[in-house]
Amino acid sequence: DRISAKHYGVAPTGNGRRDTFRNTPIPRMRATYMEAGNMKEADIISTVKKGIYCDQFTNGQVQIGAGDFTFFVKSGYLIEDGKLTQPVKYINIIGNGPKALADITMVANNDKIDNGTWTCGKDGQSCPVTCGMPSALVSKLTVGGES
């Protein structure tokens, strides 16, 4: 982390981590979090004509340089005319991080830290991480898989 901080001319942040003592520390994420908004989740859902409500995620990958990502939706629901209808599972959400953040149009007030066990994989290492965020409406993402 100190080497990267010096290279980029910024203060070290303590993000140099490694999965075992045998490996060299490398800069990586620890926790990813989004602040809560001021809307109720139900009010956001009511604005959606057709969409996917993603309840649980697993197995994500990010191409760091490009920001492209894919996340596997373990469980969720189809949104039709502002209501949660059919359950969906085994679908992928595909997008680009900076673009997806720019496409967030509404953020709910139901922030929470995920209770799952997440892992950040980088350069052959795996370190535990956590994430948290409120419900958010992203206007455009690619959805694929089976219902």
PLM features: what roles do these ranges have?
Residues 1-147:
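N-terminal small-residue-enriched
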